[in-house]
Amino acid sequence: MRVVGDRKDFDIAFAGLNKNSALFRDVQGIIDKLKNDVIVGKRIKYKQIPKYYKKRHGVDNAYHVYLPEGMRLIYSITNCEGKRTAFLIELTDHKSYDRRFGY
């Protein structure tokens, strides 16, 4: 599966991680699993997907992965140019995740 990240909500946060940190290694491990067609994390019910994701990214499915240091990775499985693609939507802290999901 192809893996791409959102420039605003994922790529900037991922690029800012310390390459030697456990968090970086965990996110890289998730990316590697996704490339091998392994679904990681828990599926988010459609009604619980934030409007922000639906409107900005046009997603109709989403998964979340709990990471060290209270971080969360949100992604969607899409079909882009005829290829199955894991679209990494957002890498966020727990507080921002709760706010985004209305908790």
Per-range role (PLM):
Residues 30-33, 47, 77:
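Compositionally biased, intrinsically disordered low-complexity segments
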Residues 1, 15-17, 60-103:
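Enriched for short, Lys/Arg-rich terminal
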Residues 36-65:
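A short, surface-exposed loop/turn module that caps and links secondary-structure elements
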Residues 6-7, 50, 93:
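Alpha-helix initiation/capping motif
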